[in-house]
Structure formats: structure tokens, C-alpha cells
Design a protein with these regions (language model features):
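Extracellular/luminal ectodomains and secreted, surface-exposed scaffolds of diverse proteins
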Residues: 117-141
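Generic structural detector for well-ordered beta-strands
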Residues: 83, 103, 134-136, 147
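Catalytic core of carbohydrate-active enzymes
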Residues: 1-111, 117-118, 141
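Generic alpha-helical hydrophobic packing signal
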Residues: 116-117, 146
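Surface-exposed interaction regions enriched in Ser/Thr/Asp/Glu
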Residues: 136-152
Length: 152
């Protein structure tokens, strides 16, 4: 371990949404998101949420001018399923489409297949040295179901 690196401890089954670094709220676009999921064989279900609004409105909660994303995972020996949905009225400047990069940590083998809303994903990256699986989904304001089948 290098002295200039700080270890990060994450709870098994945690969802960690992240955006690119930004200096001010005015430069936040919201059209790109990284969603990290920390898989673990001891976890068969997990949930996470993310709140998003325009960063300006003082009464966004009272007027439901926000999106509240819900992330749910369920796993067994053969599959990992991740569901993404949102509620709230949204806000005027919210993007119509978000590019979400899903990064699954502690993934030890290349998957047999990945289905996004029953469509086989043609592109994904499995990083053997880091034990991560990553791929992109487009969020178009409707629920997304992801099903990853493991090799046996």
C-alpha cells in the first residue's frame, strides 16, 4: 500500500452512485452516472437510493421536483438481478437520457451473459485483475431490469 492512497471500505451489497468531479452545481448536467455495486456471496438482496434535483429550487421536495432513484439487487448462485427505477415528478432541467455505467465489484468470472430488459448486452468489460464487471445502460425515464448469468 502506498502512503498516498487511502483504503476505501464499503459494505457488502452497497450501491454507490457517483458523478464526475465538478466544481460548481451549475456545471452539473446529470446525464452521466456511475453506479457501483459491491456484490458478495453473503448477500442475496440489497437496496439503495439516490436523490437528484436541479440543485437550485428551495422547495424541490415539497413540490416533488426531483427524481428518487431506487436500486435493488437480488442474487443466487446462477444470477444477479439489478432493477433501477425512479419516482418523483422530475425537474425542468433534468436530462431526458442518462448514460449509466454499472460497475460490479467482486465479480470473479466473466459472465455467461448480461440481459438488459431482456435484450442481450453485446458489450461489457470484465477486469480479471480487479474482479470488476462493467457495462453501460441508457436510462430513458422507465424502469430497467438487468440480469447477469454466471458461468458455472
Amino acid at each position: 500500500n502506498k502512503l498516498n492512497e487511502i483504503p476505501v471500505f464499503v459494505k457488502a451489497g452497497a450501491f454507490v452512485p457517483m458523478i464526475a468531479s465538478t466544481n460548481t452545481i451549475s456545471s452539473y448536467k446529470g446525464d452521466a452516472l456511475k453506479l457501483h455495486y459491491y456484490a458478495d456471496s453473503s448477500i442475496d438482496s440489497a437496496r439503495g437510493i439516490m436523490y437528484d434535483d436541479d440543485g437550485i429550487s428551495m422547495n424541490a421536495i415539497e413540490t416533488s421536483a426531483y427524481e428518487l432513484f431506487s436500486f435493488e439487487a437480488s442474487a443466487n448462485k446462477q444470477t444477479l438481478a439489478i432493477d433501477i427505477s425512479a419516482k418523483g415528478k422530475g425537474y425542468r432541467s433534468q436530462p431526458a437520457k442518462r448514460k449509466i455505467k454499472i460497475i460490479i465489484h467482486n465479480w470473479s468470472k466473466q459472465p455467461k451473459n448480461i440481459k438488459i430488459d431482456d435484450q442481450t448486452a453485446s458489450q461489457f468489460t470484465w477486469n480479471e485483475s480487479q474482479n470488476t464487471l462493467s457495462f453501460f445502460v441508457d436510462w430513458l425515464q422507465h424502469p430497467i431490469n438487468i440480469k447477469i448469468t454466471k458461468h458455472e
